[in-house]
């Protein structure tokens, strides 16, 4: 099912005459409003400690519960990518990001509450203030440092994270 099929009413006037305009938008036949279905912005953090180990998390919730992941998540309104990745790292691990340097982005899909969300995942290389006080919080079941030679991209559950790990470490 195309994500636009789930939108039945115009978000501007509430009309049920909300019809497909093209493959990425719907148009209201009553008020003329055009809604474009765009990707949601998300972040992913590559964090290395002083032993050159990668910070890895285990997903505590679906999708892909129990698989490996990197810290990150959706960017809130009015946040920059750097602010979003710093907030997500703090919420999930308790670590405070000192610096976030943009690396690259990858498209992804993410099943959230039964709804397929298209995302644009922005990858950052982050440094943290103190890597010794690591916790697993929020939607993370576990977080730990993994030696780079033990990193196996196939153990990462989300497609974009797996691809990002491949780009950076293989």
Predicted segments, located by residue:
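NUDIX/MutT-family hydrolases
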Residues: 135-165
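Active-site-adjacent beta-strand/loop module that shapes the phosphate/pyrophosphate-binding cleft
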Residues: 104-132
């Amino acid at each position: 099912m195309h994500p636009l099929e789930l939108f039945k009413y115009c978000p501007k006037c509430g009309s049920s005459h909300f019809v497909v305009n093209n493959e990425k938008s719907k148009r209201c036949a009553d008020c003329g409003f055009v809604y474009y279905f765009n990707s949601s912005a998300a972040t992913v953090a590559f964090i290395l400690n002083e032993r050159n180990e990668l910070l890895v998390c285990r997903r505590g919730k679906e999708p892909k519960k129990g698989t490996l992941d990197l810290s990150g998540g959706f960017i809130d309104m009015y946040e920059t990518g750097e602010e979003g990745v710093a907030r997500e790292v703090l919420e999930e691990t308790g670590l405070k990001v000192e610096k976030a340097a943009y690396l690259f982005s990858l498209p992804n899909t993410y099943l959230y509450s039964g709804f397929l969300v298209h995302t644009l995942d922005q990858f950052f290389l982050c440094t943290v203030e103190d890597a010794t006080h690591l916790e697993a919080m929020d939607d993370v079941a576990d977080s730990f440092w993994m030696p780079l030679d033990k990193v196996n991209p196939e153990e990462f559950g989300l497609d974009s994270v797996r691809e990002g790990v491949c780009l950076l470490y293989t």
